[in-house]
């Protein structure tokens, strides 16, 4: 399944402490699988890392020849349901849909803005075998 939010998209935080902030998506984690204390697999909801949003402080040990120790500030994860794509055409936060367009023997899949109904970008392109 294609992702509604991708790396490089500009998004707006719509819920939480950081509400209203905008930033560029640095990384998208579709689904993270971890184990709990009992060793059972746990699946976490998808989340994104957004540039300049939800800055957290980490205490790091120095590694000789690599980095200095101290307190560093880095972006923390935000649940993907708490952000909306900022449409490049109408410049508003919007929900994203998918549209399939067939032209001749080529099938193209686009992401589109549900507010202004304009295509955002091409997701995939397939050549249909003629019959």
Swiss-Prot record:
Transmembrane segments: none annotated. Keywords: Ribonucleoprotein, Ribosomal protein, RNA-binding, rRNA-binding. GO terms for cellular component: ribonucleoprotein complex; ribosome. Disulfide bonds: none annotated. InterPro entries: KOW, Rib_uL2_dom2, Ribosomal_uL24, Ribosomal_uL24_CS, Ribosomal_uL24_KOW, Translation_prot_SH3-like_sf. One of its GO terms (molecular function) is rRNA binding. PROSITE patterns: RIBOSOMAL_L24. One of its GO terms (biological process) is translation. It comes from the Bacteria. The keyword Repressor does not apply. HAMAP family: Ribosomal_uL24_B. Belongs to the universal ribosomal protein uL24 family. Part of the 50S ribosomal subunit. One of two assembly initiator proteins, it binds directly to the 5'-end of the 23S rRNA, where it nucleates assembly of the 50S subunit. This is Large ribosomal subunit protein uL24. It comes from Aquifex pyrophilus. The lineage of its organism: Bacteria, Pseudomonadati, Aquificota, Aquificia, Aquificales.
């Amino acid at each position: 399944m294609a992702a509604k939010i991708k790396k490089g998209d500009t998004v707006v935080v719509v819920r939480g402490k950081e509400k209203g902030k905008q930033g560029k998506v640095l990384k998208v984690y579709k689904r993270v699988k971890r184990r709990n204390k009992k060793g059972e697999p746990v699946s976490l909801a998808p989340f994104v890392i957004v540039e300049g949003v939800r800055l957290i402080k980490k205490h790091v040990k120095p590694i000789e020849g690599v980095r200095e120790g101290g307190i560093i500030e880095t972006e923390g994860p935000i649940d993907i349901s708490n952000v909306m794509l900022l449409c490049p055409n109408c410049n508003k936060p919007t929900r994203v849909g998918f549209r399939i367009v067939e032209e001749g023997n080529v099938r193209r899949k686009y992401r589109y803005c549900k507010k202004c109904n304009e295509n955002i970008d091409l997701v995939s392109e397939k050549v249909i075998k003629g019959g």
